Amino acid sequence: MNILQEPIDFLKKDELKNIDLSQMDKKERYKIWKRIPKCELHCHLDLCFSADFFLSCVRKYNLQPNLSDEEVLDYYLFAKGGKSLGEFVEKAIRVADIFQDYEMIEDLAKHAVFNKYKEGVVLMEFRYSPTFVAFKHNLDIELIHQAIVKGIKEVVELLDHKIDVTLLCIGDTGHRAADIKASADFCLKHKADFVGFDHGGHEVDLKPYKEIFDYVKEGGMHLTVHAGEDVTLPNLNTLYSAIQVLKVERIGHGIRVSESQELIDMVKENNILLEVCPISNVLLKNAKSFDTHPIRKLYDAGVKVSVSSDDPGMFLTNINDDYEKLYTHLHFTLEDFMKMNEWALEKSFIGCDIKEKIKKLYF
């Protein structure tokens, strides 16, 4: 890994008024997106990789030997989109084929942190599911966690803490090894490394799991859950339960809040931030198009939103692609993006000392 990189000249607020994006081509705009000091709150570490990294793993373990590189990417990944969140989850389970040993998992963590640094991310909250990483090859979740923490720390230190990284633990439903209570226990056992707890997999009403979420919250964890993402669900119960029953501080995706003025008012009254992932929403058919993505309505209504990449390995994207889509389709400005990142910093679960450092440096 080539750690040596030119330092990023991050934008300051007083520079924004002098930048005219309308006079720039796409390549020039991407240079600007990179210079935005980004605080990313919603990215699955276990699905954060480049095409080259993924293909190297597939070839190393001799997976799908009869497929070309392009066919491998089509078989495993979701870069061309699909029919639904359910189809995406099934493909993500295929990707778990590559989680075969702890060295690979450590390399994945290093790769993910370094790529986020190159994208101009200054605060990164990664989340991962111990049971998801472990289940295909019966790995030990303790050794998985050690590998991830070691990989993250090594790159953060090599980069002289120019990016700060923390972890959230996901408790899954939806695959054969899913055990949300065991994940909650694991999260609290490693509270020195985790700052929050999430639910992943198929979107479900989490009211029956209230005791588990209360348990991790009482143990010192912050709460965010995936809710209001899946448009195939017949109602908005997942959102109501997240807000009223689990009393979360943030919501992963949450774009269906836009369907209810009552929910818009509730998230504002409770100071809940929505971790919005625009490209993910469109590729999974949870938003009809970028032009009609609900983030515009939510932002204009005064709801706190942030921009995240969700599963960049599955989509073969990076966070700057999301910024490009929001600019070209919904006309968000640099001032809007800076505000979203300030909100993300405010609502981050990382320690107050790091938040204060980032605020002084970039905002």
Curated annotation (Swiss-Prot):
Transmembrane segments: none annotated. Its EC number is 3.5.4.4, 3.5.4.31. It comes from the Eukaryota. It catalyses: adenosine + H2O + H(+) = inosine + NH4(+); S-methyl-5'-thioadenosine + H2O + H(+) = S-methyl-5'-thioinosine + NH4(+). It is an enzyme of class 3 (hydrolase). Keywords: Hydrolase, Metal-binding, Purine salvage, Zinc. Its cofactor is Zn(2+). Residues 170-184 are annotated as: Gating helix loop. Inhibited by coformycin and methylthiocoformycin (MT-coformycin). GO terms for biological process: adenosine catabolic process; hypoxanthine salvage; inosine biosynthetic process; negative regulation of adenosine receptor signaling pathway; purine ribonucleoside monophosphate biosynthetic process; purine ribonucleoside salvage. It holds the Pfam family A_deaminase. Catalyzes the hydrolytic deamination of adenosine to produce inosine. Unlike mammalian adenosine deaminases, also catalyzes the deamination of 5'-methylthioadenosine (MTA), a by-product of polyamine biosynthesis, to produce 5'-methylthioinosine (MTI). Plays an essential role in the purine salvage pathway which allows the parasite to use host cell purines for the synthesis of nucleic acids. Belongs to the metallo-dependent hydrolases superfamily. Adenosine and AMP deaminases family. This is Adenosine deaminase. It comes from Plasmodium knowlesi.
